[in-house]
């Protein structure tokens, strides 16, 4: 068996996303505070949940577009804080520019770039993400032939659209493709459902029984794991 395409999840597979998001939100709030002082007190946990639900109900098309969702939530919050719609929209987009800059400021897991470099010399690589990280802005565009987000296909993993689109672009069948990711459902089950091979990245040594073709506990081990799949 020959593997021709290796697709990668990004968040929590190549870097720890919770740290990234917390810092991005902190920097965004720091930017907003002197410009819209009422924002911090308005954005309670209850209001955020209500705002998210309302925005998604009114804009079902952005359910899988986390960037558009965040912008619209900030716009609505700014309106609730007293800004006119046009001003709220402009401020939301400015605030999002701050957020996304920090969203794409990441620290890679050990061995991530070296592993991608090695694999990109052997296979076509693609990034598949439910989030809004940008492979060019994080400095991985030299390794990936292309990247697909949930916003691009209007559907999030584990739904099949992203996996199928990747194989279509790479012109490969499922038996020549493998997906790498940390999430047992979004990544592993999603890939399995479309017939792709799957490798579970289990950094924490979880004991869950995940139906992946292989499991690794560090990224450098992917090179050998994929080679073993080819030999099977």
Model-derived features: where do they sit?
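N-terminal helical cap/lid subdomain that shapes the substrate entry/recognition surface
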Residues: 2-110
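Asp-based, Mg2+/Mn2+-dependent phosphohydrolase catalytic module
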Residues: 1-6, 17-18, 34, 41, ...
């Amino acid at each position: 068996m020959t593997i021709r395409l290796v697709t990668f999840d990004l968040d929590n597979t190549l870097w720890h996303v919770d740290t990234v998001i917390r810092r991005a939100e902190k920097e965004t709030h720091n930017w907003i505070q002197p410009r819209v002082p009422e924002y911090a007190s308005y954005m309670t946990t209850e209001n955020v949940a209500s705002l998210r639900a309302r925005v998604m109900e009114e804009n079902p098309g952005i359910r899988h577009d986390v960037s558009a969702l965040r912008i619209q939530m900030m716009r609505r919050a700014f309106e609730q804080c007293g800004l006119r719609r046009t001003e709220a929209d402009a401020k939301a987009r400015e605030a999002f520019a701050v957020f996304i800059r920090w969203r794409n400021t990441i620290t890679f897991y050990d061995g991530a770039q070296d592993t991608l470099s090695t694999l990109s010399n052997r296979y076509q690589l693609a990034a598949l993400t439910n989030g809004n990280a940008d492979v060019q802005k994080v400095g991985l565009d030299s390794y990936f032939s292309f990247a697909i987000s949930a916003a691009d296909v209007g559907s999030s993993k584990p739904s099949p659209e992203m996996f199928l689109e990747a194989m279509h672009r790479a012109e490969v069948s499922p038996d020549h493709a493998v997906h790498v990711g940390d999430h047992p459902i979004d990544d592993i089950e999603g890939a399995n459902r479309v017939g792709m091979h799957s490798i579970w990245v289990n950094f924490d040594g979880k004991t869950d029984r995940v139906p992946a073709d292989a499991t690794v506990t560090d990224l450098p081990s992917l090179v050998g794991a994929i080679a073993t799949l080819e030999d099977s």
